Amino acid sequence: MTFSGFKVYYLHVLNIINFDSSDNHFALLVSLQDLLWPYPWKNWESVEMCRYDAALIPLKCKAQLDFIRHGGQVIGWGATHHDQWGFDPNLLDSTLTIPQEDKYLDCAQQYLEHQIKRARKMKVKIFRAWSYTGSNWYKDFYHRNGFEISLLEYISEISLDKFFIEDFESSVSRFKKSTYVISNLQELKKLNADWETKLFDLYERVEQDVPIDLVLDLDFDFWKSSIFCPWFKEEDVYIVVDGDKWVALSTYARSLRSNDKISTGLTGVLPEYRRQGICSAVKINALLDLKKKGFKKVFTGNEENNPMFQINLMLGFKKIGEEFGCK
């Protein structure tokens, strides 16, 4: 309501529903993601995908997800957990997803205080929040509560119908003159009995080079289960080989709900192989192959200070959104 030019919102008692892992709750979560997540994540997750990922979270991460109810209707959800990719009992991550309308600010405030209370009870030293919507609405909300942005990620996308190898002849020609070979995991695993270890070692070294606000501590079994999910395709992992050594990769993740769109997983090169155009070459090869497979769009996320963002722009990706982390 309004009074004398000021907006007044009634205070609502926080009403939350604990997630119970039932089919109904997974379906509700996916429907809320479709409603509240921005493109390209909208209509990306399926119940099967959510259920699989949830089952992987170790008990030590103490994951908690709640639905937030307002006026008798579920309007969003929030969650807290220790990061499974770099477990630290002193650091608790969180998300809060509700409609970006001022009438829900009171709900958001009460739920954030609920999350912070839980963090204090767990005696963590750092409380972080991640927003899939890098809007000023969310940034202002967290800023008012004393958070500082610690990571800004740019989301970009390319339409493959506008991607042609002729535009990158110099890069392709230069790479062909080298001794490096681009293959995919489907082919390389036939030639390498220790392919899982090789891929993990490459993945771990490349991941350590990504400018994030987290100290990674990859567990092999967790990594394996996360990467090799039921909808994973070995043909979507492109690897650059130098003799017997795996030196660079570009991985892609499919959705069970989208046949024409695919997400980039991880692209990078070992530090000692930098500045040779290897990342550009493997990415060009991957995009051309994905185009042949029938995909129409590829999207990705890069930290603002990640060199891969500039490489992607050079290849024709266009920035379409932002995500951010704060603490």
Predicted feature residues:
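Conserved acetyl-CoA-binding loop-helix of GNAT-fold acetyltransferases
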Residues: 104-117, 269, 275-288, 310-314
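Short alpha-helical
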Residues: 24, 136-137, 306-307
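A mid-sequence, solvent-exposed acidic-amphipathic segment
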Residues: 213-239, 243-249
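Conserved donor-binding loop and adjoining core beta-sheet/short helix segment
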Residues: 12, 18-26, 30-134, 241-242, ...
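Short amphipathic alpha-helix that is part of the acyltransferase structural core
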Residues: 2-53, 171-217
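Extended, compositionally biased non-globular segments
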Residues: 240, 249-250, 273, 278, ...
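Active-site/acyl-donor-binding loops of N-acyltransferases
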Residues: 145-165, 236-238, 264-265, 288-327
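Acyl-donor-binding surface of acyltransferase catalytic domains
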Residues: 2-12, 84, 99-191, 323-327
